[in-house]
Amino acid sequence: MILITGGRAQGKRAFWEKNIASGEGEPSEISGLWIRGGQTSFDECLDSPYVCEFHLFIRRLLLGEPSLNAPDWVYGTMEKRNGCRLPDREALTERLFKACPGRVLVTDEIGLGIVPLDPFEREYREETGRICCLLAARSEQVWRVPC
């Protein structure tokens, strides 16, 4: 897996398409293959080799959004906290690696700046950071794009 992280609108996908994906086709061919975590189903996100907006996928998991169609195993035995359905982080990251080991995953780095007053927003930042740390620890490459 290759994890690419950075601030919002920093050109993370374009960085991948232009500088790294040279052996996988033209950038225009690859740009149509991205699955958006804020819009896709759980299974599509699990199986896709190119996932962007992964932080929004995690947000949807925490909200228990019905359109995500997340299976029950992803939540494990964790209870709700601050309005969040907490996922089983280890099971989720394991499944992501097993389903598509060569995946390129792009996520926004959302843990910087002022800590939000809203308990859900704090929980969202914390869970996203912890899941991304687990992914980074096992990824072949981790790129931080600071533009």
Predicted regions and their residues:
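Short glycine-/acidic-enriched loop or helix-start segments at secondary-structure transitions
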Residues: R13-F15, R60-L62, V115-L117
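Alpha-helix termini
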Residues: N19, E24, P66, E121-Y124
